[in-house]
């Protein structure tokens, strides 16, 4: 049991520490005979052999990093690899932070819902739509109501008609479950 816990912790820390993949080749790990070299400042130094490029990078105190391995000849840049890796992880974290998660809120409605209860549910739907969340309005039918599903469908149609201006309405009337999905309209 102890070995397994340590084993899992090792992989957890390894996963946590390596945000970007280490597929970027540096220094001696770069394959090829000739490379197109870009200096630390961004100037093109031309095509050099692997040995010349490594000597130039080490004399300046930087690493030789392969940027475009599929180009002919491969493009390498002289730079500080640890700084490059840090910037890449920071860009990935910012991209994840700026992504918006799609949240779907669900409200259940019965076929025999009272008008005041329906108003309360619709107020909830408007609040969810203002927060730019999708809303799923599900029709719940009990017992013999399933035989008269058209009564519940009219309730869903009323809801769809009310929110047709403020939200995009997607109706799904399957055999057993009937629901609408309301997504907020994009403001241009």
Curated annotation (Swiss-Prot):
Native source organism of the sequence: Fusobacterium nucleatum subsp. nucleatum (strain ATCC 25586 / DSM 15643 / BCRC 10681 / CIP 101130 / JCM 8532 / KCTC 2640 / LMG 13131 / VPI 4355)
Domain of life: Bacteria
Similarity comment: family membership: Belongs to the IF-3 family.
Subunit field text: Monomer.
Any one GO BP annotation for this protein: ribosome disassembly
Keyword RNA-binding: no
Keywords: Cytoplasm, Initiation factor, Protein biosynthesis
Keyword Flavoprotein: no
Name of the encoding gene: infC
Record's subcellular location: Cytoplasm
Signal peptide: none
Record's protein name: Translation initiation factor IF-3
């Amino acid at each position: 049991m102890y070995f397994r816990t340590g084993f899992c912790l090792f992989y957890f820390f390894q996963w946590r520490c390596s945000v970007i993949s280490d597929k970027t080749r540096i220094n001696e790990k770069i394959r090829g005979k000739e490379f197109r070299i870009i200096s630390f400042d961004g100037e093109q130094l031309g095509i050099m052999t692997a040995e010349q490029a490594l000597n130039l990078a080490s004399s300046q105190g930087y690493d030789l990093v392969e940027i475009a391995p599929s180009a002919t000849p491969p493009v390498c840049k002289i730079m500080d690899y640890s700084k490059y890796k840090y910037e890449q992880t920071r860009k990935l974290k910012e991209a994840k932070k700026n992504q918006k998660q799609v949240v779907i809120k669900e409200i259940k409605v019965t076929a025999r819902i009272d008008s005041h209860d329906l108003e309360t549910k619709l107020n909830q739907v408007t609040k969810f739509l203002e927060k730019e969340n999708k809303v799923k309005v599900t029709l719940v039918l009990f017992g013999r109501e399933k035989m008269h599903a058209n009564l519940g469908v009219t309730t869903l149609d009323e809801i769809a008609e009310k929110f047709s201006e403020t939200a995009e309405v997607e109706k799904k009337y399957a055999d057993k479950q009937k629901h609408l999905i309301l997504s907020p309209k994009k403001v241009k």
